[in-house]
Amino acid sequence: MANIKSAIKRVKTAEKRRVANVQRKSSMRSAIKAVETFATEGNKEQALVAFNTASKKIDKAAAKGLIHSNKAGRDKSRLARLVNAL
């Protein structure tokens, strides 16, 4: 454990950020899975709504640095193809 006051604060801050990042990433993954589920069921309306939500979460994750911008584009493109195929 750190002894210096600023280092102790950095440990606490890093833990808070880690927890927030895990939540954001998990939320993004859940949104992606929702689109895939609705698409496999053939439910275009719900898949489209879920795609819009997932797209927003993917963009936010890329902006926060949780995922690379190329991965964000790739994921959105893949989901868009999935929804448009319905």
Swiss-Prot record:
Family: Belongs to the bacterial ribosomal protein bS20 family.
GO biological-process terms attached to the record: translation
Top-rank taxon: Bacteria
Any matching Pfam family: Ribosomal_S20p
Source organism (scientific name): Exiguobacterium sibiricum (strain DSM 17290 / CCUG 55495 / CIP 109462 / JCM 13490 / 255-15)
HAMAP family: Ribosomal_bS20
Listed GO MF terms: small ribosomal subunit rRNA binding; structural constituent of ribosome
Cellular-component GO terms for this entry: cytosol; small ribosomal subunit
Protein name: Small ribosomal subunit protein bS20
Function description: Binds directly to 16S ribosomal RNA.
Keyword annotations: Ribonucleoprotein, Ribosomal protein, RNA-binding, rRNA-binding
Keyword RNA-binding: yes
InterPro entries in the record: Ribosomal_bS20 (IPR002583), Ribosomal_bS20_sf (IPR036510)
